[in-house]
């Protein structure tokens, strides 16, 4: 069964007053309703099926409040124009008096009729005296029941009280029992007042007709309906909402909001519209088409309205004027904003930094942005200053289109002056945060988000920084030059050329005796280092077997195992050999002094464990690393490692003969620290004693373990290798760009140390606002920037994206802003947008069901 839809509830817009205290415009409305109550019940059969048209009420007293659904306000179909014009003709006073008499005769007989007869006689005499003058000239305060004309509002109020509010209500309702009960007292106005409060739309209320809204500009536009006088002036009213207008075009346009005939939906986003032209304009934003071009400059737009607004910048035309003052503007929205802020409009938005208040949300955002990010981008042509680079670009393109050679000087710009609490943290806090990030990365597996392919030289620089953090306990913040070099493509090649030049100069200074001596030591050092790492990895794995945490320590062994392999692959290159030759001479003295203390400790561990098991552990660890590298063949870096590892796998025989030479191993660790940076050799000579002091504590605790437990450890580790290889991701992907400084540093520090340029983008002036810049002059920037103080609204204090995926998500979130096609409000969240849209379309399905049921 279809549910009939009736007009808006009776008494919605009636004020909370006693019946005897109704204001003069309301009484005029009630008196006029008596005159127009001639409609039969047949005229209301199709009332709930579509939009109706409100019949004109004389003397500019337009009403949005209706009594019961009969004999209140007559409606006619929009299509019946001829019938409407006949009904809107002038009404003769004689039938009015007859109707009033007929209605009053039908009242209950318990009331005295003497007063009514006297009142009717008085009305007839007044009608005969004023009939001719009323036809020629009518004053605003005109009483239709008795044809009384008041000079001002006060006289009219005094006169209208003579009729009595109760009599007017009885005349409206006839003999119905409900209206008779309404005559009993003022309690009947309370339910209407409650319904008015519950159904009210806003806080601003029209005193004449009860129209209410929460927007001051809508209220000012509504008052224009009352200023246009005349009986032939029609008022069109929406039966679903409180919309009223005097324009039939706008009334039909509003009707389409409730009854969309066809919806055009965008396949790329959630936009939809019932207007094909709006849909075509929206599709152009996705395709990048800008067919509307300016004839005076290079400006182009996807919408004709934007081009029309742009042309006013060339002509200087300001056609929109404020109704209350002499303010002129090029756009209507500027006049609306001016009326809100200047002419008694509510200002609910207040700035938290100063006493600024406004009603415009866009201006509020721009004002707060000036506190956080002041205007530092200055126009070189005029005195305009912008808070963002994209706004200055749009300003130059729109205001100075002829100046093509303008270059923006952003060298002195310092953006993001007021940062959040996380950005203002001290270096020690940054170190703690980075340590947490590194632990999370180790647990979750390696993630490489960088687009560029890191070279070996960049890896050496990163290991130098990580070694300093591990030895000193403090994070050395990179200089701005290092930040810029990490964000560009060329610095890696430049550093390689510089290092080659330095090594070439230093090679000429070295003698042939040093070259031959170092080359002989190098072959022995590699074998000793690989054997020593295998021994330490076995000793580290014995503890997790006892503590039931084998998997975590196996990851640490993975990182320590790949370190000598990276050193071997790196030393095989001729460039690395030339560089290491020059650095050994500088670190020679330091290495000899530092290798005396750990010699005894290392010899003890070698005696306890034995040479045969060292060879077995070395083979096991190499097989495990080979399996894990074979798991991910997609990375080209890991393929290179695999091939180089196979070449070096045939050297375990030399490691057996040279295991008892700890001095060579310690000098190799000092070379690894010094070979990473040639210029910092002095600093490296001071740091190794701190790093080398760690083996004094750890190896004695592990060396007490008996030899008989080694086969049991091997039996436990072999099934664990299959589990780790399938469950854990490949760790060498992270370590490919970072080499560990020494064999013992892996115990005290995490294996993966991301540098600061990976966590925060450099605050370069050219790249700071690349997300917000619109080189093509987008439509959003057009509509927001023209005639306003600043066009960037939504990007006030956003942080720069830290990763490429975050940047992609941020750009996608901006594209998904939803704009209501009915009231042009924008919503960032789709959920809020859907809720708002349901308010417009809440009665569509009910009305369609009613229309189908009526057929």
From Swiss-Prot:
Main localization, broad class: nucleus
One Pfam family from the record: zf-C2H2_REST
MF term (GO), any: zinc ion binding
Listed Basic residues bias regions: 594-604, 639-648
Chain residue ranges for the region called Disordered: 172-199, 458-811
Gene Ontology BP, a term: negative regulation of smoothened signaling pathway
Biased composition, class Polar residues, residue ranges: 186-199, 548-569, 652-662
Keyword Isomerase in annotation: no
GO cellular component: cytoplasm; nucleus
Sequence ranges of Basic and acidic residues compositional bias: 462-472, 481-496, 504-535, 570-580, 628-638, 711-721, 799-811
Keyword terms, alphabetized: Cytoplasm, Metal-binding, Nucleus, Repeat, Repressor, Transcription, Transcription regulation, Zinc, Zinc-finger
Key word Metal-binding present: yes
Zinc fingers, C2H2-type class: 141-163, 204-226, 236-258, 264-286, 292-314, 320-343, 349-371, 377-400, 818-840
Alphabetical list of SUPFAM superfamilies matching this protein: beta-beta-alpha zinc fingers (SSF57667)
Role, per record: Transcriptional repressor which binds neuron-restrictive silencer element (NRSE) and represses neuronal gene transcription in non-neuronal cells.
Domain-related comment: The C2H2-type zinc finger 5 is required for nuclear localization.
Protein name, as recorded: RE1-silencing transcription factor
Gene field: rest
């Amino acid at each position: 069964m279809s549910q009939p839809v009736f007009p808006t509830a009776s008494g919605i817009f009636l004020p909370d007053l006693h019946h005897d205290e109704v204001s003069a415009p309301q009484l005029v409305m009630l008196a006029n309703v008596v005159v127009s109550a001639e409609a039969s019940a047949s005229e209301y059969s199709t009332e709930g099926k579509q939009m109706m048209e409100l019949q004109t009420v004389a003397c500019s007293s337009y009403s949005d409040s209706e009594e019961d659904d009969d004999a209140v306000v007559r409606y006619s179909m929009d299509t019946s124009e001829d019938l409407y014009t006949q009904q809107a003709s002038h009404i003769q006073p004689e039938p009015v008096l007859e109707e009033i008499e007929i209605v009053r005769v039908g009242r209950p007989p318990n009331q005295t009729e003497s007063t009514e007869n006297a009142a009717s006689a008085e009305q007839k005499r007044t009608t005969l005296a004023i009939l001719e003058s009323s036809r020629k000239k009518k004053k605003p305060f005109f009483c239709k029941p008795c044809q009384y004309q008041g000079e001002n509002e006060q006289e009219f109020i005094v006169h209208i009280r003579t009729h009595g509010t109760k009599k007017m209500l009885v005349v409206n309702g006839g003999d119905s029992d409900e209206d008779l009960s309404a005559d009993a007292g003022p309690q009947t106005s309370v339910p209407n007042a409650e319904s008015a409060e519950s159904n009210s739309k806003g806080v601003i209320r029209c005193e004449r007709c009860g129209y209410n809204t929460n927007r001051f500009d809508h209220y000012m536009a509504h008052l224009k309906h009352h200023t246009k006088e005349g009986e032939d002036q029609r008022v069109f009213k929406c039966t679903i909402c409180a919309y009223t207008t005097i324009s039939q075009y706008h009334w039909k346009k509003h009707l389409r909001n409730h009854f969309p005939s066809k919806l055009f939906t965008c396949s790329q986003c959630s936009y939809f519209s019932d207007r094909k032209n709006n849909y075509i304009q929206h599709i152009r934003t996705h395709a990048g088409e800008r067919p509307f071009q300016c004839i005076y400059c290079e400006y182009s737009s996807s919408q004709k309205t934007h081009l029309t607004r742009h042309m006013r910048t060339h002509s200087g035309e300001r056609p929109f004027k404020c109704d209350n003052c002499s303010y002129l503007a090029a756009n209507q929205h500027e006049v609306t904003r001016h009326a809100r802020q200047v002419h008694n409009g509510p200002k609910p938005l207040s700035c938290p930094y100063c006493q600024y208040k406004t009603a415009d949300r866009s201006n509020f955002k721009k004002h707060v942005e000036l506190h956080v990010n002041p205007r530092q981008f200055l126009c070189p042509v005029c005195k305009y200053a912008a808070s963002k680079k994209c706004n200055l670009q749009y300003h130059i393109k729109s205001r100075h289109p002829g100046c093509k050679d303008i270059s923006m000087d952003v060298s002195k710009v310092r953006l993001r002056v007021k940062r959040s609490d996380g950005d203002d943290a001290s270096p020690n806090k940054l170190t703690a945060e980075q340590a947490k990030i590194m632990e999370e990365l180790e647990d979750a597996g390696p993630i490489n988000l960088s687009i560029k392919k890191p070279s070996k030289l960049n890896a050496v620089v990163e290991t130098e920084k990580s070694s300093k953090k591990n030895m000193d306990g403090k994070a050395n913040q990179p200089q701005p030059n290092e930040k810029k070099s990490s964000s560009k493509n060329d610095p890696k090649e430049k550093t390689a050329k510089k290092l080659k030049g330095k090594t070439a100069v230093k090679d000429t200074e070295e003698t042939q005796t040093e070259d031959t001596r170092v080359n002989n030591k190098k072959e022995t050092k590699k074998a000793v280092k690989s054997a020593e790492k295998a021994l330490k990895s076995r000793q580290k794995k014995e503890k997790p077997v006892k503590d039931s945490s084998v998997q975590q320590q196996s990851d640490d062994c993975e990182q320590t195992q790949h370190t000598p392999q990276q050193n071997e692959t790196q030393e095989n290159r001729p460039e690395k050999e030339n560089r290491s030759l020059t650095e050994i001479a500088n670190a020679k003295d330091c290495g000899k002094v530092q290798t005396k203390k750990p010699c005894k400790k290392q010899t003890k561990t070698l005696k306890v464990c034995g040479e045969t098991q060292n060879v077995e552990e070395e083979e096991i660890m190499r097989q495990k690393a080979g399996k894990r590298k074979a798991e991910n063949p997609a990375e080209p870096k890991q393929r290179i490692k695999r091939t180089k590892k196979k070449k070096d796998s045939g050297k375990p025989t030399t490691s057996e003969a040279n295991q008892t030479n700890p001095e060579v191993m310690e000098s190799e660790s000092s070379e690894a620290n010094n070979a990473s940076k040639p210029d910092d050799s002095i600093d490296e000579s001071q740091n190794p004693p701190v790093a080398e002091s760690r083996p004094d504590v750890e190896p004695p605790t592990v060396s007490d373990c008996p030899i008989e437990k080694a086969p049991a450890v091997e039996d436990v580790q072999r099934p664990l290798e299959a589990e780790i290889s399938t469950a854990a991701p490949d760790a060498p992907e992270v370590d490919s760009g970072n080499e560990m400084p020494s064999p013992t540093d892996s115990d005290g520090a995490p294996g993966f140390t991301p540098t600061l340029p990976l966590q925060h983008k450099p605050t370069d002036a050219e790249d700071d606002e690349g997300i917000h810049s619109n080189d093509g002059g987008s439509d959003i920037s057009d509509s927001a920037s023209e005639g306003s103080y600043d066009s960037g609204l939504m990007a006030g204090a956003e942080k720069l994206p830290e990763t490429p995926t975050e940047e992609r998500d941020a750009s996608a979130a901006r594209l998904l802003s939803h704009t209501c096609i009915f009231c042009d409000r924008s919503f960032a969240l789709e959920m809020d947008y859907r809720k708002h849209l349901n308010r417009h379309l809440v009665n569509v399905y009910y009305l369609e069901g009613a229309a189908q049921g009526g057929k």
